[in-house]
UniProtKB/Swiss-Prot annotation:
Stored InterPro entries: Znf_RING (IPR001841), Znf_RING/FYVE/PHD (IPR013083)
Expression (tissue specificity): Predominantly expressed in stems.
Organism: Arabidopsis thaliana
Name of a matching Pfam family: zf-RING_2
Catalytic activity: S-ubiquitinyl-[E2 ubiquitin-conjugating enzyme]-L-cysteine + [acceptor protein]-L-lysine = [E2 ubiquitin-conjugating enzyme]-L-cysteine + N(6)-ubiquitinyl-[acceptor protein]-L-lysine
Superkingdom of the organism of origin: Eukaryota
Gene3D superfamilies, per database record: Zinc/RING finger domain, C3HC4 (zinc finger) (3.30.40.10)
Official protein name in the record: Probable E3 ubiquitin-protein ligase RHA1A
EC number: 2.3.2.27
GO molecular function, one term: zinc ion binding
Amino acid sequence: MGLPEDFITELQIPSYILKILYVIGFFRDIVDALCPYIGLPRFLDHNETSAPDLTRHALSTSASLANELIPVVRFSDLPTDPEDCCTVCLSDFESDDKVRQLPKCGHVFHHYCLDRWIVDYNKMKCPVCRHRFLPKEKYTQSDWGSGSDWFSDEVESTN
């Protein structure tokens, strides 16, 4: 009732495959590390991959729409008394901080926090309450994507 005699040799075949895969991965890492030295981009660095031109254009369009519709003002110039801290970075507002106040919900954020939310994370809704801060007509009039509004319709139907 013990193990079969050829059990050890059956286990050695997968270990050879694992060793081969390890060596291939090692050489891949070496080639990736040498790419910048020979003028090629690194192919394993996902943080530095460039977006396609369409995506880059879409991000710049959304950022310019945000600049147009949500102006930057000083925190001390706000007519109402909003929250004491930015809910994106959790830092307290100072009177001379440059902020953006969203028109629909009134939430206030540092301008760089909201800009990063828009551009880096591609979010077009308030970080706190998820209200769309770009009106749908502005969103669809802009060429903020491929021309179809399937994504926003999908999001609208889930809310």
